[in-house]
Amino acid sequence: MCAYRLQYSLRFNIYDRFENVCFEAQLLQDEIDSLCFLFSKYFNQSLIVDSKGLTFFTEFNKCIVSIKSSFENQANNTDNIHNVKNIFSIFLRDEFIKQVPHFRTIMQYLQKYYNPTPAPDVDAIMCQSCKPANKIQCFECKCKYLASSLSTLDAGLQNGWDIFLRPMFGMPLMLYVLLRTDYKNESDIINENNLITQIFVQFFYNLICDKAYSLYTKRDMCVPFVKECKKATVGLRQEDHERVLSILSAQCNGCSTVANGDRLLLPFKNFMIEMGRNTKMKKVNKIASTVLIGFYLRHYLESLPNKAYPVAELELRNVCRFIMSKYSDENINLLIHKLKLIKIDICNVLMTEMIVPETFIRHIITKYQLDNEISLLIELNHDCFNK
């Protein structure tokens, strides 16, 4: 089959100076059709992008299989935990990918609690032949839509996102194109590994900066949840504030670790029952942990009185204790301290470097002695979003 040259642009900046850099990827027509279909699902524009005969899981799985194959063919990829592709492989596990079809259901249901995020301007893309049907149908328009989707996704990953599942779904699509981009005419700093590093570092920074809640959550819509959680958390010990996620997760699995654990779980249980009714999901318990981590946990934490930490840090502590379940209090405190310092380092590099080099990852892991944490994440033999 004939390969097409797709031109797209990504945004880079130093302080307030922004620069759009044009890239060129070589893609087959089937790949372009597949990526357009997946991006139309990502941006909730599937009704105006023609994609007959394609199914979400099949196309997304093709994307993941291709990325994993590319990563596995890289020399020393499996031997070096400092390799950004090895770290990124955490998000490419089969257990995690099986959850992705549910992610779309979750994103669609929770969208009403978030401010809208930018999407490609379809009207500006459509040619005169496609406009009568109000649908992107011709190959040329699909190429334009794909290029616009990549630029919009890139800006969205930099500016922050509404639901934490969004980058989980979007980053593999970007990765797929980066792995098919020609870097021969680019400067040494602009290469595959550095661009992947740039995306990962920006993603991680936004995650620990609490951008989703602070910038995109419609807090007035969530007030009823906080009120319900306030009733349920009465009597919860302060030392358990950073274990709420672990307590609720255990309670979901029928293991009570605190007094009145069933009462503590009730607000979230009611929310999931209502979500099940509205989404027609037969086994809503399959997505319970994902919804709890990504959305409802925050309302429990907002409702707590006499908090020892800011809510954003309390949320981070809950997630760290949940994932690093065998860590002692001392180890958790040390990890949180490291993350605070890492956030400063990342902020500095994002502001002063147009492109963050892969060596930055190695520098951070070595500087803060993160080999143990990275190894634990890479070697997890279960899906931490579905314990």
Swiss-Prot record:
Family of this protein: Belongs to the baculoviridae p48 family.
Organism: Autographa californica nuclear polyhedrosis virus (AcMNPV)
Superkingdom classification of source: Viruses
Main location: host cell
One of the Pfam families matching this protein, by short name: Baculo_p48
Lineage: Viruses, Viruses incertae sedis, Naldaviricetes, Lefavirales, Baculoviridae
Alphabetical keyword list: Host cytoplasm, Host nucleus, Late protein
Annotated GO CC locations: host cell cytoplasm; host cell nucleus
Compartment(s) of residence: Host nucleus; Host cytoplasm
Function: Plays an essential role in the production of budded virions (BVs) as well as in the envelopment of occluded derived virions (ODVs).
The protein's name in its UniProt record: p48 protein
